[in-house]
Regions:
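A structural motif
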Residues: 34, 92, 206, 252-253
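Acidic-and-aromatic substrate-binding clefts and catalytic sites of carbohydrate-active enzymes
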Residues: 13-17, 38-50, 69-77, 103, ...
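N-terminal pre-domain/capping segments
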Residues: 1-94, 128, 180, 278
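Conserved, mostly hydrophobic/aromatic
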Residues: 29, 55, 87, 151, ...
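Acidic/histidine-rich catalytic cores of soluble enzymes
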Residues: 37, 139-237
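Active-site acidic/histidine proton-transfer and metal-coordination neighborhood
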Residues: 57, 61, 72-181
């Protein structure tokens, strides 16, 4: 049985789009077979006394907490440790860190060499910002493990982030003990990389999945990228059904997070109906 989650930000968007209250949209999600939400840590920390009871009343849990940090430059890990403590207190076993960014020139150099693992590894080992991230993530992974939490990176859709492409991600997984991977199906298109190959190469590290799809554009003719437009999960050009089947064949039993920012929740097929049709 697939476990479905949805981003809490989508819940808030659906309220704006439909005029319904947050509890009403949460109840709708539960009726559609969704059992959890993806939660931004800062939002939860600022509204915990409101959000936690609403989720409990709806029969929903938090599948993963996510937050942006600057481990490439900031050595203070206090806020990240607070996030891990909060996740543990809510029985959240996965957190996603957007862990930092490079300067534009550094990012361009990494992009130029990221087609091979050997060149990628040389760059990553010599870059100070990336080494700062490694030290921070290593410390936090150890801190998290003591609390029953796994920290993850995703294939981020940004040029400056050194975890946007396949080989840099593999390098991080191999150099940070305990680090795990959140597969975002839609984000390799940003770097014009093959999501199927990436999922295969990184399969042993995958503990969480974002089901983000992409809409085709007649103006985009990349090798793997045919557009970056938003579209409800399962309706775009990415091989989502096959990827999910392959994950299940590898005994993946984690959450599948529905991610489709700016797509109308109430005018799209339900997650349950979409699963039946694929």
């Amino acid at each position: 049985m697939r476990k479905l989650s949805v981003f809490y930000e989508h819940i808030l968007q659906a309220c704006e789009q439909s005029g319904k209250t947050i509890p009403e949209v949460l109840a709708f999600c539960r009726e559609q077979g969704i059992s959890a939400v993806e939660m931004n840590y800062s939002l939860f920390a600022s509204e915990r006394e409101v959000i936690a009871p609403m989720l409990s009343d709806a029969g929903l849990v938090i599948s993963c907490m996510h937050e942006t940090f600057d481990f490439s430059h900031d050595t203070d890990l206090g806020r990240a440790q607070q996030m891990l403590d909060t996740a543990a207190s809510q029985q959240v076993s996965r957190v996603l860190f957007v862990a930092g960014a490079l300067e534009t020139a550094e990012a361009a150099e990494l992009a130029a060499c990221s087609s091979t693992y050997e060149a990628t590894s040389t760059f990553m080992a010599e870059n100070k910002s990336i080494q700062n991230m490694v030290h921070a993530l290593s410390s936090l992974a150890e801190y998290a493990a003591l609390r029953g939490v796994s920290i993850t990176l995703e294939d981020f859709d940004g040029f400056l982030q050194p975890f946007a492409r396949t080989y840099p991600l593999l390098w991080f997984m191999e150099h940070v003990p305990g680090l795990r991977y959140t597969l975002d199906i839609g984000n390799f298109a940003f770097s014009d990389e093959d999501v199927s190959y990436a999922a295969w190469l990184l399969k042993d590290y995958i503990v969480h999945v974002h089901c983000k799809d992409r809409a085709e554009s007649p103006l985009v003719h990349g090798r793997f990228c045919r557009g970056l437009g938003q579209t409800p999960a399962g309706t775009g050009y990415l091989p989502m059904a096959k990827l999910l089947t392959d994950l299940e064949a590898c005994d993946y039993d984690g959450y599948l997070a529905i991610e489709h920012f700016d797509c109308l929740l109430y005018t799209s097929p339900s997650p349950r109906d979409r699963q039946k049709s694929r």
